[in-house]
Amino acid sequence: MTRVMARRTIVSVALGLVMLSVTAAHAQKTEIHFWHAMTGQLADALEAQAKEFNASQNEYEVKPLRKGSYAETLTAAIAAYRQKSPPHLVQVFEVGTQTMLLSGAVIPVHDLMQQNEIKINWNDFIKPVAGYYMKDGKLYSMPYNSSTPIFYYNKDAFKKAGLDPEKPPKTWKDVEAYSKKILAASAAKCGFSTGWPSWVMVENMHATHDQPFASKNNGFDGVDGVELLINREFGQKHIGQLAAWQKDNVFSYGGRAGTADPKFVSGDCAMYMQSSALIGGFTRSVKFDWGTGELPHWGAPYKKATSIIGGATLWVLKGRPSAEYRGVAKYLEFLAKPEQQMAWHVNTGYLAVSNTAVKNLEQGYHFVRNPKQYTAFAQLTGLPPTPPAAMQDKKAAPPKPERVATPNSQGLRLGNFVQIRDVIEGELENIFAGKKTVKQGLDEAVTKSNGLLKEFAAANKP
């Protein structure tokens, strides 16, 4: 063998050893399985976070996997736990909270971090988010993609109708008046629509008007004897008005979940109520000039309260080898970092869920440059409607908060909530189609939902 060939052989062997070393190191990484329900650009952002974590260390490999819709992901996770093959982490939407709390399948994130000696400042999470997922003073799931419904409006349609494009309506009477002007000017085919009808028009309308959605402190005081209260005076007033507006296109019902989104994106409806998480998607898909505002209010005698959250948190499931849970804890620690929350907010439109992240965004003039993304924070937390940083160079007095947090706006904790939401939306559809009166529809929704609540209580007796 010539010297040249010998050298080539040595180099080849050395390179082979390096490749084997890299492969072995990669193979030694402990996999952390993470089931989620994200799609499109949101799924891309979730995958990017996991890749960044994976590249930051050599011990763990987070493996995200979409399992379907929120409801399908929840069902799949519970089934996998019962079959003793659960993922380490699962993303569960807010209506699954009571189910998860009483499932016996979860490790509270507070306990997980304590067991792994990882310090998290639990008090730094913003109260409306943390409060939704706490039990007995402990945070049970890690806040992740939290949102709240806000008001979107077409500025071009406002201009065509002679309305001020920088002043969205603040009251429901304003919404009606603006809609009629828009229709009269042929600026749009309908005044407004909504996504997620139960979440926006029933759950959040009760919260923002300081009205109870259910008894027993909206379910926070236990599962026994909880009943829905949405067929009372306020529920009948609000849903009744929507049904009346439906007749003359002031309001146009567009279906459940996000099926009404095209009504706004196409310009058919000039105003729209949907999750704050759609800001990123609308920025890419909407071709006209648009803005955001807070949810409309009916005014006196109702108090103007903060809104409640939607979105989801990350739950840690039991049933995996104990040594693997340190990797779960490390990933949750990574996601809790202010810089990760800030990037997640900017890239997706979901809320940054810690006070530190929100403060950093404010001090960096992010909300001044991106006022659309400030709306949700103001409405959810009771912050002034104008970013404080925007007023620093002005002589005018700083704006005062317009909303207050109340027990009725802290959230909802109900068993079988996924099914209850379906019941409510089915009856809303009957009302909007004229098949039932408002009272008949809401009474039926309450009766059916109370049956589901009783079933849940019976199945979860201590």
Q: Each predicted region: which residue ranges?
A:
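Extracytoplasmic "Venus flytrap"/periplasmic binding protein-like
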Residues: 48, 52-125, 160-170, 263, ...
